């Protein structure tokens, strides 16, 4: 089995197991609907790829007896009394941003290019996001 492609939604629905099996194995799995083609991808593979492609570039600085975290280029920042608290707050702030992006920011010109980081945030658990922020390999 190589590429799995179905030319219509109806055909894909009838072969959903084949699409899912192909995606889970890392094969190309696509569905065409009208003029759009959509890929099905295993979540763990996509998350791993995005985390290796998108560095967090988080900057953590001591400030006023605590710690502040921000990511240049993203409208997200967090503070905490300790380093770990600041990182935990940043995980929460990233989740809020991803929710806002999905809800109303995805078409805003100054946010639409954040698609990849929003996918990474949404596909990660809290520990994975923490590791991504501090640069730990998982």
Question: What are these model-derived regions, one by one?
Answer:
Residues 12, 69, 86:
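Hydrophobic pocket/interface hotspot
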Residues 5, 72-84:
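A short, exposed loop/beta-hairpin motif centered on an aromatic-Gly-Thr core
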Residues 54-73:
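Short aromatic-glycine-(Arg/Gly/Cys) micro-motifs in beta-strand/loop hairpins
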């Amino acid at each position: 089995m190589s590429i799995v492609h179905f030319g219509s939604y109806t055909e894909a629905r009838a072969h959903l197991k084949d699409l899912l099996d192909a995606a889970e194995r890392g094969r190309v799995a696509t569905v065409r609907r009208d003029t759009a083609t959509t890929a099905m991808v295993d979540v763990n593979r996509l998350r791993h790829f995005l985390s290796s492609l998108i560095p967090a570039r988080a900057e953590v600085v001591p400030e006023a007896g605590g710690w502040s975290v921000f990511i240049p280029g993203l409208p997200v920042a967090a503070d905490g009394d300790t380093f770990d608290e600041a990182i935990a707050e940043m995980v929460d702030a990233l989740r809020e941003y991803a929710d806002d992006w999905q809800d109303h920011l995805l078409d805003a010109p100054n946010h639409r290019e954040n698609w990849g980081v929003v996918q990474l945030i949404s596909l990660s658990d809290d520990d994975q996001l923490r590791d991504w922020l501090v640069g730990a390999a998982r």
